[in-house]
C-alpha cells in the first residue's frame, strides 16, 4: 500500500472466507474471500484491485483469481487528510483554546465515516470534533454534559469566525 506521513499505511482486513465442504479435508475448487480495505490518500478502488492482482501474479495465481468490488449505490469511501495549518483546523483550535483554555491537538484517524463523503465527494474541508463520552455507536451512547456545552460554544465561535 501507499504510505501517508500522518495516516501511515492502508490496511487489509479479511471479513469473510468461504470455500470447500464443511467437515471434509479437501482443497476447495473455489474459495471466496471478502476483504475490507482502508486506503490512504492517493489510493482508490482501482489501486486496490491492481494490488490484489499483483499479489496473485506474484504467487503464480493470476489465472485463478478474480477480483471484483462489492456493488454499492454510493461512491467508495476515499481517504483524505487536512494539513495542520488548514484554516478550518486552526480556527477550530483557536476557538477550542478560547473556550477551554487548553490546546487542541491535531490527530489523524484511519477510518471512514460521513466526513469522507463531505471532504472527497463534495470538496468540503472536514474535521471530526465532539465531546468525549461512552457507548460509542450504541443505543446508550452519550457525551459528558459539560463537554457538550463546551463543544456547542466551540462550534459557534468556529462558524462565526469562518463566516467573517
Regions found by a protein language model. Give the residues of each.
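Metal-dependent amide/peptide-bond hydrolase catalytic core
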Residues: 1-164
Amino acid at each position: 500500500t501507499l504510505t501517508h506521513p500522518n495516516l501511515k499505511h492502508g490496511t487489509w482486513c479479511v471479513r469473510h472466507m468461504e470455500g470447500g465442504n464443511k467437515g471434509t479435508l479437501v482443497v476447495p475448487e473455489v474459495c471466496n474471500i471478502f476483504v475490507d480495505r482502508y486506503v490512504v490518500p492517493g489510493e482508490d478502488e482501482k489501486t486496490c484491485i491492481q494490488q490484489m492482482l499483483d499479489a496473485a501474479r506474484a504467487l503464480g495465481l493470476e489465472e485463478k483469481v478474480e477480483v471484483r468490488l462489492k456493488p454499492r449505490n454510493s461512491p467508495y469511501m476515499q481517504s483524505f487528510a487536512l494539513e495542520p495549518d488548514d484554516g478550518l483546523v486552526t480556527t477550530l483550535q483557536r476557538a477550542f483554546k478560547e473556550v477551554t483554555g487548553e490546546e487542541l491537538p491535531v490527530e489523524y484517524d484511519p477510518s471512514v465515516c460521513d466526513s469522507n463523503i463531505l471532504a472527497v465527494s463534495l470538496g468540503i474541508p472536514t474535521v471530526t470534533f465532539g465531546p468525549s463520552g461512552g457507548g460509542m455507536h450504541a443505543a446508550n451512547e452519550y457525551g459528558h454534559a459539560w463537554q457538550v456545552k463546551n463543544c456547542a460554544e466551540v462550534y459557534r465561535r468556529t462558524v462565526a469566525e469562518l463566516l467573517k
